[in-house]
Amino acid sequence: MEKSNPTLDLATKTALLTWQKSNALLQHGIERATPFVLAVKSKAWQDAQSIGSKVAEAKFRDIDRTEITTITSVALGLYFAYVFCLVFYRLYLHPLAKFPGYRICAACEWYEFYCYIVKGGQWGNEIRKMHEKYGPIVRTSPWELSVRDPAFYDQLYVTASTRKTDMWPRGREGNGFDNSHHLSVSHELHRTRRKHLEPFFSRQGITRIESRIAERVMKMDDRLVGLKGSGSIIEVDHMLCALTGDIIGQVSSGMEAGLLDDPEFTPAWKDLMIKSTAIAPLFRCFPWINKFLQSLPTSIMNSVYPKGISNMMLGKTGQQNIEKIKTQIATSKRDLSDVSVFHHLLSSNVPESEKSIDRLRAESMILLLAGTLAGAHTLTFVVFYVLQNPQIEKRLRAELQPVFKGYPNKMPTWAELEKLPYLRGCVKEALRLNGLVGNLARCSPDEDIQFHQWVIPKKTPVGMSIYAMHFDQNVFSEPEAFKPERWIGEYNKQMDRNFVPFTKGSRSCLGVNLAWAELYLASAMLFRPGGPKLVLHDGGESDIKIARDYIMGFPKAGAKDVRVKIE
């Protein structure tokens, strides 16, 4: 390095040494360097300063490369040491270390990501394999357990009088519904929020608005009657998503969405629902992604990750409805609390924090999503399996004949229809075959839970699968078959224990009564005597059977939609 420097005269060398010494002194905080003051003012000093800087820079480059390499090595070493210690702790020292399961699941969450995202919705299937290998309780992540034992269901999903039940915080992160009643973490907050919603969703509350549900069901029938004899082919799930979307829109906000009015039954609504559900596992694995996407302008999000826009659009729909309701309440001279769920909430004396846009937007999103997709999927199963078997269709139509004698002047009521055993069997079989696949994790915040010889520590998330309950071969003969008659007459009462489409306990589905009402009314209308004749157009059972787990169950990739021809 010295050879590359220009030749220095004696004065310059002296000044250079002076500069270096002065710098060293100043570096150590010595401000009084009197012998060097005159040198600083000299021309030689200025030249030396320039040369010294070049020498220092050259030395710094050498030091920089060395130090960067050293720092990088140390950082990597510390990181790998941290990972090693973390994995060691999770495998051998963690409170859940005694529970069986794949070692990779105990060590990290990446296997769940791999099964959900890379393998395409196979996490539920992988949990099933773990249970087959290790038994009724397995560790599915560093923090979470899964149980397969129907007798334990009522001990896990308990009422508030038995034990407090919290939501697992990590299980709700990233989906944008955090402020909804369903995903409220603490038992107390969930109970408070749900209490204000229950009057609208009680049996009495749904009976009071049953005429609104019936009006939408009759509108669907009018659309089908208009196509009678035309040979038109329609997408069943588009039509049924439009129906359930119109119903939940009316119940939640009193708004007339008009999804059934669209000639194609508003396929964009069904696509929005599917995308919002299918993206949930990604947000569960990486909660920050949704928060980041929500901060982007719509145009940028649409180009970066088009699927991510679904949650944004769903949230905007809910927010617009809530803002309209606030305006209606502010300008109306009469009490609007009985119009819809959000009219009721915004007119009540709940704390103002519970009336915020962010809070109610989350509530609206989950009501629209669950209220649309769950009911539509179940009705699609009813349509497919009834039409697939002429004997089932014939028996169902015959049972409906007496209650539809007065139609269209008199529509059969929910109370009348639920008494029909074969219709009830058809609805229950559709619910059974269409159960949620993913585990619904619950935490006991204050008490350990005993499961056989295992003691599950308090605050540990434990989940069970509705789908596994519904396909238990020890309870349901031919569990994959659609057999309405299995629910008629004398039958194995363990079927009632295992039948949990709306789960149980203090966090059971809020909309259970709404779901029953629309399932009975819509199923009966689709197969009423004198109605349009529906014929399956193409596809088979493999196009509807659940093969993928995105929280809700989905058919195989590339499956055809259920389509019917109207004769």
UniProtKB/Swiss-Prot annotation:
EC top class named in words: oxidoreductase
Transmembrane segments: 68-88, 366-386
Name the record gives this protein: Cytochrome P450 monooxygenase BOT3
Residues the entry annotates as binding heme: C509
Cited function: Cytochrome P450 monooxygenase; part of the gene cluster that mediates the biosynthesis of botrydial. Botrydial is necessary for colonization of plant tissue by the T4 strain. It is a strain-dependent virulence factor since highly aggressive strains like SAS56 or B05 still retain substantial virulence when botrydial synthesis is impaired, since they produce also botcinic acid. The first step of botrydial biosynthesis is performed by the sesquiterpene synthase BOT2 which catalyzes the cyclization of farnesyl diphosphate (FPP) to presilphiperfolan-8-beta-ol (PSP).
InterPro entries: Cyt_P450 (IPR001128), Cyt_P450_E_grp-I (IPR002401), Cyt_P450_sf (IPR036396), Cytochrome_P450_monoxygenase (IPR050121)
Compartments it resides in: Membrane
UniProt similarity note: Belongs to the cytochrome P450 family.
Keywords tagged on the record: Heme, Iron, Membrane, Metal-binding, Monooxygenase, Oxidoreductase, Transmembrane, Transmembrane helix, Virulence
Gene Ontology terms for molecular function: heme binding; iron ion binding; monooxygenase activity; oxidoreductase activity, acting on paired donors, with incorporation or reduction of molecular oxygen
Gene induction: The botrydial biosynthesis cluster genes are co-regulated by the Ca(2+)/calcineurin signal transduction pathway, which is under the control of the alpha subunit BCG1 of a heterotrimeric G protein. Expression of the cluster is also positively regulated by the cluster-specific transcription factor BOT6.
E.C. number(s) listed in UniProt: 1.-.-.-
Listed cofactors: heme
Known pathway: Secondary metabolite biosynthesis
GO cellular component terms, semicolon-separated: membrane
Keyword Transmembrane listed: yes
Disruption phenotype: Abolishes the production of botrydial and accumulates high levels of the biosynthetic intermediate beta-acetoxy-15-alpha--hydroxyprobotryane and small amounts of botcinin A.
